[in-house]
């Protein structure tokens, strides 16, 4: 064998070991010369390997053969059957052939496919992967903690929603009970009806609650159909007849001077008042299908109350109504009859008048004044806004105090009796007198309940009744004071609807005597200073 520097020492020693004849009993070429055989591994490892190599380990020899590309040859017939340990072992390489030692240069030791640089790069990549995995793990833990928090918050929110739903249902039940109570309160106490019937008190002995005076003039006629004389017809507007009670017509005239009003004398019969110059252009028509009476109209100079009622108007009147006409609904008899019977009649008359709009307006007051309502429920005592009571107890046809109202002064011409039906109207001289537009002075005496709720106590009402004769319509010699009364008393702002405000009464105001006095339910006969309209 030719020595070559390109052939590794292991291959040179192996070639020499196989070529020598004295070692053929341990290692030799195969029959075809393409491979070599190791006949006895144990003896070969103990006797031959130490001579050529520095070890006697057969496994190390086989490992070096594998490093140079030698492969162990396994025959088909013996591949399945396990060979004996001491049997021959054959190794083969494409460039290791018998008699071709020049091919040994082509046998190269296997070099690892990975380079150190590549190993470093792989290590860096592995570090990056590990760090990213750690970050992902941290994020996952954070997300899990957040998820647990969200779950707990969701559970608490659902609990709160269930509690709120229960509270809402309970509140709805409370509101439903409150509404039922208010409906009962309205039906029992008549606080809502805007069409509540009130007796018309036109006497001048009661204390005037406001500086509003009403002068009624009448003119006798022969039939039941009466017309209102007037110089201008454009001021009249027709209105639908709502009930069979007293209706006040307002005749708008712009051209009359202020004059004084004479005293209307009393008679023991039904009286008709006629005048040529009368204070306002107002006609009052009353249905006489039933025997209803109005109180006697008295002048400012008379201090004694009227004893005989005044029959006014007829149901057959066809005179037109103004846009500012006011309908006054009569009430049941409030004289000395049984209070329980009287209240039952009022309830029966007014329950049918309750409308949806009025009830809804009253129910809206719950949102405005819940604390006052609670105080009323606890003490079962309440008071009402006086401005609202004025709106409640007036007629359903609202009249703006600044619309189509004129102030005139006229003189009474005489009285004439009739028992059928009478219509009041003004004379032509009264229509020619000078007037103040948008203002009309009307005198009336309301219940003490209204006066009390407007801010006057019961004692003030009684004191006002004793001085009524001095506070009625001004006399002929004081026309300037009437103007001042008009300017100071009439509110130029339009009437606005108000809600009921319930306030607790004091102990003095809530006493039994005071409440009976306010409601005109005193068991004793009423004072002669307060004659009522028996309707």
From Swiss-Prot:
Region Disordered, annotated ranges: 298-325, 418-437
Please report which protein family the annotation says this sequence is part of: Belongs to the HSF family.
* Record keyword Metal-binding present: no
Q: Which residues bind DNA?
A: 7-112
Q: Write out the GO MF terms.
A: DNA binding; DNA-binding transcription activator activity, RNA polymerase II-specific; identical protein binding; RNA polymerase II cis-regulatory region sequence-specific DNA binding; RNA polymerase II intronic transcription regulatory region sequence-specific DNA binding; sequence-specific DNA binding
Keyword set for this entry? Answer: Activator, Cytoplasm, DNA-binding, Isopeptide bond, Nucleus, Stress response, Transcription, Transcription regulation, Ubl conjugation
Instruction: Give start-end positions of Basic and acidic residues composition bias.
Output: 426-437
One GO CC annotation: cytoplasm
Comp. bias intervals (Low complexity): 313-325
Recorded hits in InterPro entries, A to Z, give: HSF_DNA-bd, Vert_HSTF_C, WH-like_DNA-bd_sf, WH_DNA-bd_sf
Please give the Gene3D superfamilies that the UniProt record associates with this protein.
Answer: Winged helix-like DNA-binding domain superfamily/Winged helix DNA-binding domain (1.10.10.10)
Q: Could you tell me the superkingdom of the organism this chain comes from?
A: Eukaryota
Q: Where is this region: Hydrophobic repeat HR-C?
A: 359-384
Q: Could you tell me which species this protein originates from? A: Mus musculus
Query: Could you tell me where this protein is found in the cell?
Result: Cytoplasm; Nucleus
UniProt cross-references to PANTHER family, sorted A to Z: HEAT SHOCK FACTOR PROTEIN 2 (PTHR10015:SF185), HEAT SHOCK TRANSCRIPTION FACTOR (PTHR10015)
- Which Pfam families does the record cross-reference, listed alphabetically? HSF_DNA-bind, Vert_HS_TF
Q: Which SMART domains match?
A: HSF (SM00415)
Q: Which GO terms describe its biological process?
A: positive regulation of transcription by RNA polymerase II; spermatogenesis
Position of cross-link Glycyl lysine isopeptide (Lys-Gly) (interchain with G-Cter in SUMO2)? 2, 82, 135, 139, 151, 210, 218, 237
Record protein name field: Heat shock factor protein 2
Tissue specificity, please? Answer: Isoform alpha is expressed predominantly in testis while isoform beta is expressed predominantly in heart and brain.
Ranges where the record places region Hydrophobic repeat HR-A/B? 119-192
Query: How does this polypeptide assemble, per the annotation?
Result: DNA-binding homotrimer in stressed or heat shocked cells, otherwise found as a homodimer.
Q: What this chain does, per the record?
A: DNA-binding protein that specifically binds heat shock promoter elements (HSE) and activates transcription. In higher eukaryotes, HSF is unable to bind to the HSE unless the cells are heat shocked. HSF2 is expressed in a form that binds DNA constitutively but loses DNA binding by incubation at greater than 41 degrees C.
């Amino acid at each position: 064998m030719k020595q070559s520097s390109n052939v590794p020492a292991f291959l040179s020693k192996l070639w020499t070991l196989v070529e020598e004849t004295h070692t053929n009993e341990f290692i030799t070429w195969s029959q075809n010369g393409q491979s070599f055989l190791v006949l006895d591994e144990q003896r070969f490892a103990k006797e031959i390997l130490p001579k050529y190599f520095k070890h006697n380990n057969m496994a190390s020899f086989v490992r070096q053969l594998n490093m140079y590309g030698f492969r162990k040859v396994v025959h088909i017939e013996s591949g399945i059957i396990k060979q004996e340990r001491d049997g021959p072992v054959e190794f083969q390489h494409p460039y290791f052939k018998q008699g071709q030692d020049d091919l040994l240069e082509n046998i190269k030791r296997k070099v690892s496919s990975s380079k150190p640089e590549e190993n470093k790069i792989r290590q860096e990549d592995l570090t990056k992967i590990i760090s990213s995995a750690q970050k992902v793990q941290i994020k996952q833990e954070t997300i899990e903690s957040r998820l647990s928090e969200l779950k707990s918050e969701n559970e608490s929110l659902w609990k709160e929603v269930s509690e709120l739903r229960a509270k809402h249902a309970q509140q709805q039940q409370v509101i439903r009970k409150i509404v039922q109570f208010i409906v009962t309160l309205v039906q029992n106490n008549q606080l809502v009806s805007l069409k509540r019937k009130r007796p018309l008190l036109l006497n001048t002995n009661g204390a005037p609650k406001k500086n509003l005076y009403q002068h009624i003039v009448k003119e006798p006629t022969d039939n039941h159909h009466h017309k209102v004389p007037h110089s201008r017809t454009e001021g009249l507007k027709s209105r639908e007849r709502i009930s069979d009670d007293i209706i006040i017509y307002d005749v708008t005239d712009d051209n009359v001077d202020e004059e004084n009003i004479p005293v209307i004398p009393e008679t023991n019969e039904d009286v008709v008042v006629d005048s040529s110059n009368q204070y306002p252009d107002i006609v009052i028509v009353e249905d006489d299908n039933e025997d209803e009476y109005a109180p006697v109209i008295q002048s400012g100079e008379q201090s004694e109350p009227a004893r005989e009622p005044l029959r006014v108007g007829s149901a057959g009147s066809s005179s037109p109504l103004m846009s500012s006409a006011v309908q006054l609904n009569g009430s049941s008899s409030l004289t000395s009859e049984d209070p329980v019977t009287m209240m039952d009649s009022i309830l029966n008359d007014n329950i049918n008048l309750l409308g949806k709009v009025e009830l809804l307006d009253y129910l809206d007051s719950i949102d405005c004044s819940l604390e006052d309502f609670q105080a009323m429920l606890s003490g079962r005592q309440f008071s009402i806004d006086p401005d609202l009571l004025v709106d409640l107890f007036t007629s359903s046809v609202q009249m703006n105090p600044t619309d189509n109202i004129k102030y005139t002064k006229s003189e009474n011409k005489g009285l004439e009796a009739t028992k059928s039906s009478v219509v009041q109207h003004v004379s032509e001289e009264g229509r020619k007198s000078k007037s103040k537009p948008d203002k009309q002075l009307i005198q009336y005496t309301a219940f003490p309940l209204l006066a009390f709720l407007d801010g006057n106590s019961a004692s003030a009402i009684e004191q006002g009744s004793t001085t009524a004769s001095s506070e009625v319509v001004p006399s002929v010699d004081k026309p300037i004071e009437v103007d001042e009364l008009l300017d100071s008393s009439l509110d130029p702002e339009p009437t606005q609807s108000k809600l009921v405000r319930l306030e607790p009464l004091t102990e003095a105001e809530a006493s039994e005597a005071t409440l009976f006095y306010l409601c005109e339910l005193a068991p004793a006969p009423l004072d002669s200073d307060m004659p009522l309209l028996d309707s």
